[in-house]
């Protein structure tokens, strides 16, 4: 049994397979998952696990070069906006796009990790960086 990192075998596999600029979505429970994009559904019940908790866990094991958020989070979800700002301070480039554009960009993702988050616009597209 693994002692460190992600115990979820699908998440561990996806993170290990990511290459430079590949994208991974962390989503709330309402984001539509595009057909053909792998979904790892972590949702247990409304609010669990949360978006930020899940994002923090992924970021502990993932080199994020760029993060894309829906611009609507600035007005409707201050916690997500605050997290975006902290990611920028840690060195990730940020993009903000309309929620409709965000959903279109999800079609190119390697996978979507669906959380139980039930606050608006709690979604991010993470683009993989390199560790060297």
From Swiss-Prot:
According to UniProt, this protein's pathway is: Carbohydrate metabolism; D-ribose degradation; D-ribose 5-phosphate from beta-D-ribopyranose: step 1/2
SUPFAM superfamilies linked: RbsD-like (SSF102546)
The GO annotation for biological process reads:
D-ribose catabolic process
| Entry GO CC | cytosol
Query: What reaction does this enzyme carry out catalytically?
Result: beta-D-ribopyranose = beta-D-ribofuranose
Q: Which domain of life does the UniProt lineage start with?
A: Bacteria
| Subcellular locations according to the entry | Cytoplasm
Q: Which residues bind substrate?
A: 28, 99, 121-123
The record's PANTHER family line, in alphabetical order, gives:
D-RIBOSE PYRANASE
The record's function comment reads: Catalyzes the interconversion of beta-pyran and beta-furan forms of D-ribose.
* Listed name of the protein: D-ribose pyranase
